[in-house]
UniProtKB/Swiss-Prot annotation:
Belongs to the UPF0225 family. PANTHER family: ADENYLATE CYCLASE-ASSOCIATED CAP C-TERMINAL DOMAIN-CONTAINING PROTEIN, UPF0225 PROTEIN SCO1677. InterPro entries: NTF2-like_dom_sf, UPF0225, YchJ-like_M. Signal peptide: none annotated. This is UPF0225 protein SCO1677.
Amino acid sequence: MPTPPCPCGRSESYEKCCGRFHGGTAAAPTAEALMRSRYCAFVQGDASYLLRTWHPRTRPARLDLDPGMRWTGLEILDTADGSAFHTTGTVTFRASYRGGSLHERSRFERVDGAWVYADGEFLD
């Protein structure tokens, strides 16, 4: 039986995709990869990963995820910078959930060489 694809939308299995980042065996190499892994963490309810990958300057003291929230898909709409050669980047995306969607432009920065989520701007 084929392995289901990662919730982030890539065709790889969770273990070969975002699971490596969640488990700490690899770091997201780009801002988009971090965005996808953070979406996947929301799907899985992994608040500790979300906090770990949040910029220390903007990170909340705690994060309470709604256990009833059902995320249903991620669409990357645009990326700017955020590669291995950049220190900042943005990812514009639409994340769908049961009953609606979230449209955001997220800003990412490198801290000690690792990509972290800095903040985001809700769109429409």
